[in-house]
Amino acid sequence: MRELPEISQDINRVDSAIRELFLLRMSLALEVAKTKAQSDDKIYKPDREAEIVEKRSAGMEEELQLKYVSLLQSMIRASREYQYSEILRQTPEKFPFYP
């Protein structure tokens, strides 16, 4: 059995990798927002989001699947909010109610 410090180091490495992947995902979300702003495409696409969650979580053990779905939904929501803020920044005239 491995010692706790060794396991903790592995967790730290995984957390660092997750951080880098999250930053990459948000960078891609920003790219998506810019493209959608130019084409007047909608940010929120519930069917697409549901499809992503379903495909990515398929085949997982049930308890872990529930936790992963929660994590994935949170990440998708953060990406969507980031896209909205970018579109607001790019095209404030589309949001006349925004101060």
Residue spans of the language-model regions?
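Domain-level signature for soluble enzymes in the chorismate/prephenate branch of the shikimate pathway
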Residues: 1-99
